[in-house]
Amino acid sequence: TLAGKYRKMHIPDDPGFYEKFYFTPGDIGFRPVDTSVGRLGVLVCWDQWYPEAARLMALAGAELLLYPTAIGWDPADAADEKTRQRDAWVLSHRGHAVANGLPVLSCNRVGHEPSPLAADRVAGASGIDFWGNSHVLGPQGEFVAEAGTGPTLLLAEVDLGRSEQVRRIWPFLRDRRIDAYGGLLERYLD
C-alpha cells in the first residue's frame, strides 16, 4: 500500500551531483504523509538544506522530519574541509529540529561510488565517499541515536509528545511575524 508521495523540490547542480541534467523539480509542494507511526515530513536529499521546506512541513502538521539522503565528499578534499561539510550537514538538521520543535531522522548512504565520467578519472577524481553518520534528533536538536560511517541498523525510540512540550517552552511557530516575511518570496532583496 502506498502511504503517500513526495517529489524532490530542490535539484542540485554541483560537482558530483549534476542532477538538473536528469530530474525536474517536484510539483506537489510540501505535504506530510499520514502513517501508523505519525505524520511524516519527508524531504529528499538536497531539500534538507532548505529551512523553508522544513518549516512548511511543520506548518502542514508533520510530526517527524525524515531526510533520506546520499551526501558525501570528494576523497581528495582535505580532512578539515570534510569535517566542516559533515558538521554543517548535522548542524542544519539540529537547527530544523529546534526551529520547528520536531524530531529529525536522517539516513545517509555509506561507501564509495566511483565517478562514471572518464574525464574525471583522467583528472584524478575518484568519485564520492558517502559519509554515513545517519542520526535521530529530538525536538531540541539533541542526539537520540547516531550511526558511524559504515553500514548500520539504527534503532531509536522517539517520543512524539515531547514536541508539544518543547513548543510550549519555545513557541517559535506561534510567535512568527508572518506579516513581515513577504521578502522570503523574492529571489533577492534590494
Where is each model-derived feature located?
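CN hydrolase (nitrilase-like) catalytic-core segments centered on the catalytic cysteine
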Residues: C45-L154
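Basic phosphate/pyrophosphate-binding loop/patch that engages nucleotide-derived ligands
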Residues: T1-L2, G38, G95-H96
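Active-site beta-strand termini and strand-to-loop segments that position acidic
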Residues: V33-S36, P139, V158
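Catalytic cores of transferase enzymes with a strong primary signal for eukaryotic protein kinases
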Residues: K5-G29, V33-G38, Q48, A54-M57, ...
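A structural microfeature
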Residues: L2-G4, A145
